C-alpha cells in the first residue's frame, strides 16, 4: 500500500468483507461483475485450460497469455467482431498476463467461519475479548455446543422458559427440554427454523458475540477491575506484614492483572486502527492469485504437479457448495450442522493445517502445506522471496580477521570489488578518456590491467559498502565500512566490530551491498559507519571492545623480563653468546628503539633503557617514597640512581640531568600507537589548537 506521503509500506491485519470484495471484484466492459469463485475445478482434463468460475478462471484472474483470451482471439487491427477491451464470447479481458500475480478472487461462504489464527494461536484474541478460555470457545466453533441467541432485545423461548441456566448448554440437553416444552408446529409462520430463531452455533455464534462487544466498555471495566486488584493486594500486604502472604492468592491476582492488561491493550488497538472484532469471523474467504499457487506440467505430456493450496481450496469450495444446496433444499438440521463443521475444518486446514487437531493429508499420508506454512519460516515467502531474495550490486563471502585494518575499514576481495563496482568503473574509465567506449572498457576490465586497479581504488574511495550478517536482529546487524582492496576471496574485518554482528571467525559469512544513490551513501557514511556505532542500542554498554585475541596479543607483546632491574647483574642469556650485551642498551628516542628492532639488534622482549622526555618524576612515581637500589658514580662527578623501573642521572649538585625508564620493544611500540591515536583524536576534536606532545 502507499500512504498519503507516498511511502510504500506493507501492513498485515484484518480485512473487512467490503475490503475483500474491493480486492477481488471487477466490472467487465459489458457491466458484468466477476470475482466470485464458485466451482472447485482448476484445469480442464482435455484442453488444460482454466475452467470457467474455477480457482484458475481467466475471467476472474486475467489471461494466461498477454492479450489473448480463452478462445485464442486477440484484438487485431481491422477485426471489428472483437472488442478492443475484452472478448464477448468468453468474457476475458485483453490485458497483461502479469495481472495473475496480484488479482484475487473470493469464496462466498454459506456459513460464517472463525479465523483459526485468532482462535487457536497464543494469545487467543477472540478468547481474550470474550473473557473465556479457548476450550470454551472451541465447542461452539466446531458445533459441539450451542449458544442461546438473543433477538432484538426480545427473550427467546428457551430463555423465557428457564431452560438455560448458563449461556452455554449442550445440544443434547437443549433438544429434550425444547421438544417437551413446545411443539415445533407452534412457531409463528415466517419465524424461521428452530436453529435460526433460538440457538446459534459455529462461526455464527462467535460472530454474534463479537458483534455485540462494546470496546470502550471493556476498557473501562477492565481498568476498574485492575485498580481493585491493586488495592486488594496492597491491603493484603498491610494486613500480613508479619505473617507469610499466601502465594497462591498472589499468583491468581498477578495472572488476572496480566489478563486485564492484555485485554485493555487489545481493545485499544482495535479502537485505534478502526478494526471491528467481528472481522475475525469470515463471511468471504479470499482466494490467492494463481501465480503463488501454480500448476506445473513436468516435460511434454508429463505429470502435472500442483500446489497444496489448490487442493485445500477445492475442498473448501466442495463443502461450501454442498452446504449451499442443503440450505436451498431445507435439508435436515443435523446434516446442516455437520456440513458447517466440515467447512470450518476445511478453512482451518487452508489457513493453518499444522494447528488443526487432525491435519489434512494427501494420498501419501503427508500433511498439506497450508497458507501459514507457505509464508512462515526461513523458507517462507517473506524471508526467502521478499526479504532474502538476491539483488544487484551485492555479494557474499566468508569473513576473516584483518589486523591491519582500522575500525571503519573492511578488506574487500579484488574479485568481488571489480564486479560490484563494474558500472562505476566503466563510467570512470570512459570519463577519464582511458577507454573510448563501453566495449573497450569491458575488455580492459576482463584483462585486469594495472590501470584498472588504480582507477578502482579511486572509485572505491567515494563509495562506502554495507555489510550484513543474518539474522539481522538489531540495527548493528548492518554497518557501513570503507572498502580496501585485499588479495584472496575472504572479506577481512576488524575484530572489534564483530560484537555488533554477533559474528566470529569460524566460517561465518556476510553479505556485501553497495548503496547507489547519493542519499544512501550519505546515510551510510554519517550514520552507519562502525566508528559511530560503538554503543549497544539496547542497554548503552560499549559493544566495540577489544576481543580476547587482541588482549592476549597485547599481553604477549608487552610482557617483560621477570628479573627486572637485576638483569643488569645477572643477564638471562649465556655469557658466551656475544650477540647480547651484558648490560641493557640505552636509547634516546622511540625511533632509535624501532630502528634497532628492525635491524634485529634487539628482539621484542629485550630489556632496555629509554630516555624519558619529561623531567617531572611525579608522572612516574614518588621519589621520596622509593630508595634507589644501586648508585653508580662517574669520573666527572655525575652519578646514576638505579631504581626498579627508572634510572636518574644527576649532576654534581644533585640536579636531575635526564631520566631513563626501563621498558621493552613491545611496550615501546604499544605506547607509540596509543600516543598517535590520542594525538589524532585530540587534533580532530580541536583542529585549530596546537596541542603539546602527549606522553603515556
Curated annotation (Swiss-Prot):
Residues reported to bind Zn(2+): 69, 71, 87, 90
Note on how the cofactor is bound: Binds 1 Mg(2+) ion per subunit. Binds 1 Zn(2+) ion per subunit.
GO molecular function: DNA binding; DNA-directed RNA polymerase activity; magnesium ion binding; zinc ion binding
Sequence positions that bind Mg(2+): 504, 506, 508
GO biological process, one term: DNA-templated transcription
Xref: InterPro entries: DNA-dir_RpoC_beta_prime, RNA_pol_asu, RNA_pol_N, RNA_pol_Rpb1_1, RNA_pol_Rpb1_3_sf, RNA_pol_Rpb1_clamp_domain, RNApol_RpoC1
Pfam families, per the entry: RNA_pol_Rpb1_1 (PF04997), RNA_pol_Rpb1_2 (PF00623)
EC number: 2.7.7.6
Main location group: plastid
Top EC class, one word: transferase
Keyword Zinc: yes
Origin superkingdom: Eukaryota
Coiled coil: none
Its biological purpose: DNA-dependent RNA polymerase catalyzes the transcription of DNA into RNA using the four ribonucleoside triphosphates as substrates.
Name under which the protein is recorded: DNA-directed RNA polymerase subunit beta'
